[in-house]
């Protein structure tokens, strides 16, 4: 019974996986994204951003179908695996400030910009 109490106490302190493996990757990414229906739309928007015709945030507000568009596409911080694949993998592979090529998911086509990592 005391082992159960210890386990429950530890579970409330940290997730079981974090307790078992203290070297677990806890890196979080803060990313913004633009969600559109088609790959050609995403390619066109990315070109506008890269050419300096529009900022990523303004493009998100103008084009994105996601409710995050009102915040410039900001999704906040998230851990690996918390977002749909391959979105999550691409976000974690990008460097801060980098904008992805179009990424297809079941929701549509995304442009991802990593804002911060911690």
Regions found by a protein language model. Give the residues of each.
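Proteostasis/folding factors centered on peptidyl-prolyl cis-trans isomerases
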Residues: 3-35, 86-118
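Solvent-exposed coil/turn segments that connect beta secondary-structure elements
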Residues: 34-41, 65-66, 80-83, 114-118
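A generic structured-segment signal
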Residues: 44-48, 58, 89-90
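Short, flexible coil/turn micro-motifs enriched in small/turn-prone residues
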Residues: 47, 67-71, 92, 103
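Peptidyl-prolyl cis-trans isomerase
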Residues: 50-85
């Amino acid at each position: 019974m005391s082992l159960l109490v210890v386990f429950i106490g530890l579970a409330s302190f940290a997730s079981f996986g974090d307790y078992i493996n203290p070297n677990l990757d806890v890196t979080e990414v803060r990313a913004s994204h633009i969600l559109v229906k088609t790959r050609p739309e995403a390619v066109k928007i990315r070109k506008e951003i890269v050419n300096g015709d529009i900022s990523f945030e303004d493009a998100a507000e103008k084009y994105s179908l996601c409710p995050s568009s009102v915040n410039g596409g900001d999704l906040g911080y998230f851990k690996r695996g918390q977002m749909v694949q391959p979105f999550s993998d691409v976000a974690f592979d990008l460097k801060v400030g980098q904008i992805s090529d179009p990424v297809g998911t079941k929701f549509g086509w995304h442009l991802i910009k990593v804002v911060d990592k911690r």
